Amino acid sequence: DGKKDQSYFLSRLTQNQLSSTIFPLGAMTKDEVRKIDVELGLHREGMDESQDFYGGDYTDLLNVQDRKGKIILADSGKCLGFHNGFWHYTIGQRKGLGIAYSEPLYVIALDSRRNEVIVGTEKATRETTLLALNPNWVGEEDFEEGKIYKAKIRSTSRGEDCRAFRTPDGFSLEFISPVKAATPGQSAVVYDGDRVICSGVIERAE
């Protein structure tokens, strides 16, 4: 089921782990599974499906008290406003910043040491290269240096065309067209068609 593909999350599993894994619903769509659930009385028809592992605000799980910090414009270093903790924000976020500017602003970096949220224009969110570390070479035998692959930098991505290269500690990607808000700490997953070739943790993007 392409709409429910979980390969982005499973890409960190090794071949040894996958060899002991069974996906009994792998050949079925979510709609087909839901129909069986309804027939068995496990779900009622029309019931909303769950999208998250936690129904509340994820910041509740951090058990951290709010702490005032600055919202900084990247280009000038000017303070545009204040926030209650950098952990309330995500890279690429546009809504809910609570500041006014001549054009839309996006979160482009989070400085945990200074408790600062760095913002910039849409152009500042675009990157053409990234470095990923801690690689998991799922399809290493089929990897070709410099070949054009599809890469996902978030689970909801359709995949972006890029060239992939090995590095001493991982791999680098050069995107054919700029991508938006490649976030350090998130996974970068490289595909050849629908097959995962490798996965790594984004170290930086520019």
PLM regions with names:
Residues 1-196, 201-206:
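Nucleotide-activated chemistry modules centered on ATP-dependent adenylation/adenylyltransferase
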